[in-house]
């Protein structure tokens, strides 16, 4: 049957662009016809607002048929690995693999429902505030990354990684990452081990591990899922309902800096706070920097935890532990000093040349003049 091997893949990974080749329908009509998909999308976004992931999806646990196919055809032998694939999907158009009609219909339906749910959820968050869309992007990228990890580590479906990589514009050679892809990913992760200067580079390819490739794809997917898409009237009621909840939630983490003089914050700290307020997923180095800095200038643990409630991956218990540790209320009892300007530059958290050696010096100088 035409495109049969792709149905289980699209049921698990509906964000793939190949869906537009496999399915052709009016999205508005289909969403109104399959109302369950809009409800499923609502649950996904609702949990994203709460910082949780919805695991109850329209998925399919079937194998990628080409990997074990016994058909003696060129496409299965050469294209089943997706090596060199350009996403034309022409090699799957004439699939002659036989499955009972009921099974084929199930594969098709699961893929279609998964795709409609994905589309509806993208539409809903596209009509909402940036912080909701960011939480959604972080949660969904993490969810699909977990599926991909399961497919690779438990089922040996490595061709699926190649398909996802091609779809996201990532260049891979085995488990090596092309330098252009590595730079795109590392610009957002901002972890010391993701700095190009710390990696082995040969003929344009960066030595990376399987885990790093999967982490890189997760980051690229997060960037894709954060983009806005056109919104259909079919999800308007869901948007109104969830927008009310998002408004209530955002009021909980409205930024209150207490006695802190916002005008005297150094540019680097203002930038980190701005990203937090927009619901951005800031790197660990930036989280440590802003936490230690705000503690150093007099903010309380509870006040700082309240700031982090807008983070897409906020976890109250984990955040409290980390903030209390930096404050010296756990561990050895020593309060940490915020990083110097040199350290901020090292981790790409510096955004301006303030002609000082430490963010605290900037703040104290400004306060003394006010």
Swiss-Prot record:
It comes from the Archaea. The keyword Hydrolase does not apply. Keywords: 4Fe-4S, DNA replication, Iron, Iron-sulfur, Metal-binding, Primosome. Pfam families: DNA_primase_lrg. Binds 1 [4Fe-4S] cluster. GO terms for cellular component: primosome complex. Belongs to the eukaryotic-type primase large subunit family. HAMAP family: DNA_primase_lrg_arc. This is DNA primase large subunit PriL.
